[in-house]
């Protein structure tokens, strides 16, 4: 899938996160801002990158503003942002399980 427009998913409420995704031509860039970055930053980034990889996203700018979200919330917000940023949303649901 190719990111064709900017999109948002999530909130800045406690235990949630806001994902901003936009087109980028030269690879994947992930920017993480988190209240718990020193404890969980690498893990949050891994969950987000795994989700992006499973959906075939190789070129995008992804900015995550985390407020202590669980893994399932990170994955859900990344998937939702992607679904809003592509022209045709036909994911392989088995790859997301």
UniProtKB/Swiss-Prot annotation:
Q: What are the O-(phosphoribosyl dephospho-coenzyme A)serine sites (modified residues) in this protein?
A: 14
Q: Pfam families of this UniProt entry?
A: ACP (PF06857)
Q: Which GO terms describe its cellular component?
A: cytoplasm
Q: Write out the entry's keywords from A to Z.
A: Cytoplasm, Phosphoprotein
Main location as per UniProt: cytoplasm
Q: Where in the cell is it found?
A: Cytoplasm
**Similarity section:** Belongs to the CitD family.
Q: How does it assemble?
A: Oligomer with a subunit composition of (alpha,beta,gamma)6.
The free-text function statement in the UniProt record for this protein reads: Covalent carrier of the coenzyme of citrate lyase.
User: This chain belongs to which protein, by name?
Assistant: Citrate lyase acyl carrier protein
| Gene of this entry | citD
